[in-house]
Structures are given as structure tokens and as C-alpha cells.
Amino acid sequence: MINYQDILNASDPKVIFLKCERHVIEDADYRAMDGLNQSYLKKVYTHGVPHAENQRLNPMEKTPALVMGSLFHTLVLEEDQFSSRYAVLPDIDRRTKEGKLLYAEFEAAAGGKDLIKEADLNTAMRMRDSAVPLMYEGIRPDKTNAMNEISYSGILEIEYKWEGEDERLELPFKIRCDMVALVDEGNGKVIEIRDIKSLASLSDSDVIGSAKSHLWSMQCAFYRDVVFAHEPKPSKFVYVATEKEAPNMSRRYVCSEEMYQRGRAQYKHALVKYAQWLKAGKPSTADYVGESILNA
């Protein structure tokens, strides 16, 4: 049985990136690659490995919110892919028999594309117009100092102590960055890893709430460390957040050093959980949960 308290009390783990490669590949090819990604590690950190495995094996169906987020992402970073991914619904009343038939015909003709309403497209385009100036700030017109939708993969080694014994395990990893840019800052150049987010609003409560609940800190740290392993230069992580509600404003959020360090501790914690799960023979949920001391 794996005791969560043992994980909490484990010595500070050490992560070494043994191999790190950069890839210019399509999203489908990235998804097919083997490796732990930030979404999986977040689930391990918050819920445990069995939940992360269940999420991996049973991907969540696309909700309207997910489609909207993906649409916004495409318009900002891959606008040339819009027509191959989305079909704009005509004005159809699906409450009527005729409307249901027309919708079914349109869906079949779309050939698997995501169906979006014209009103949602208009909102996403306003969001795009707001986000693009910030997302591409400092990027040359020919974009030679930036790469969109860039992937990295490799092998990392996690070292830690468990019940007084030294443990070591090599694990595959992968990340996909919205943008990696080399920008001028002060007397030198800095790598900026930029990620776009769509939020209900840019109120402090919405931004901080989303950052905490979705562990932006872990993504920031994991991505910075992976990119540094490939190219050891000063870097920072920037979120460009855009609100879904009018007037659809955008803002840059630069992750602090404290947030980065917190994220490093989080992803290392998740790696220890995963490593011990593997060493224990991939136990079932019931065997894995164990007992923890709660001091909430």
C-alpha cells in the first residue's frame, strides 16, 4: 500500500533532464507520442495516478466551453487551420422536425468538424483581436524569433529518498507550447514561453481562482524547465489571458519566481507519486488510497 503521507514527507526530489528534443509536428502526432505531460501530472498531483490514468484512457467529451477555447486558440495561433477544423452552423431551429433534419444533414456534411454558432465565432474573433497584439508583442513580422505550437519530448530522471532508500527512475515526458519566443529584454535576450487562456473575466477573483484551481504554477515550472533543458538561456513564462465577456479585454500575466518554485515542487511531487505507483505494480484505486494524516 502506498501511503500519501510518505509522499508528503519524502525528501526533496531531484529531476534531471537526460534527453530533450524539439519537434515541429501536428497536434495529432504530438498526442500520439508517449510521455508524461502537464495535464497528466496535474491530475496526479490533485487526485492521484488512478484518476490520471482514467482521464488518459477515457478522454473527456468536447463540451461547448472546450470547443470555444479551442476555437479561440486556433484563431490566435493557427488561423490558417480554421476552415479545416470548424463549420459555422446556419440559423436552424432544432426544436422543429425540419430543423432537426437540417442539423443532422449539416453535421454529416461537416465531416467531423466542430460545429460552432455564428455568435460564438463573433465572440472568439473579438477575443482574438484583443489577444493577438499581446501574444505577438516583440515578435518580428517574419516571426523568425518565435515558434507557435512547438513540441518538446525526452527522458527525465527522478531521484528521491523513500523510507530511507535512494530511488531513481527514468520517465518519458512531453510538452506542447503555444509559443516560444526569443525577445529583447534589457541588455540581453530572454526566452518567453507564452500561453493563451480564455477566462470568464479578468477580475482578480476569476484570474487567481483559475490559476490556483488549474495549477498554472505547475505548467509554468514544467515548461520552463523542459525548454531550459533544450536551450539553457534565461526564460520566463507569460500567460496572455482574454475574457469571454464583453469588452473581451486581454492582459499579460508574467509568472513570478515564487510561482515558478511552487510549481517545481508540485510537479516533482507528482513525479514521485507516479514513480511509486509504477514501483508498486500499478495498484488499483482501493489499494493505492491508503491513509493520510489530515491537518486541514
Tell where the protein language model's regions lie, with residue ranges:
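Hydrophobic/aromatic-lined pockets within catalytic cores
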Residues: 76-81, 198-201, 228, 275, ...
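Short, solvent-exposed loop/turn segments that connect beta-strands within catalytic domains
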Residues: 161-170, 185-190, 231-233
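Glycine- and acidic
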Residues: 57, 204-209, 251-252
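Conserved catalytic cores of phosphodiester-cleaving nucleases, focusing on short active-site segments
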Residues: 175-209, 223
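Metal-dependent nuclease catalytic cores that hydrolyze phosphodiester bonds in DNA/RNA
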Residues: 1-174, 289-292
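Surface-exposed cleft-lining segments at the edges of enzyme active sites
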Residues: 159, 165-166, 203-212
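A residue-level signal for conserved active-site and pocket-lining positions in enzyme catalytic cores
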Residues: 72-73, 179, 267
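Metal-dependent nuclease catalytic regions and adjoining charged, substrate-binding loops involved
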Residues: 2-7, 210-217, 222-296
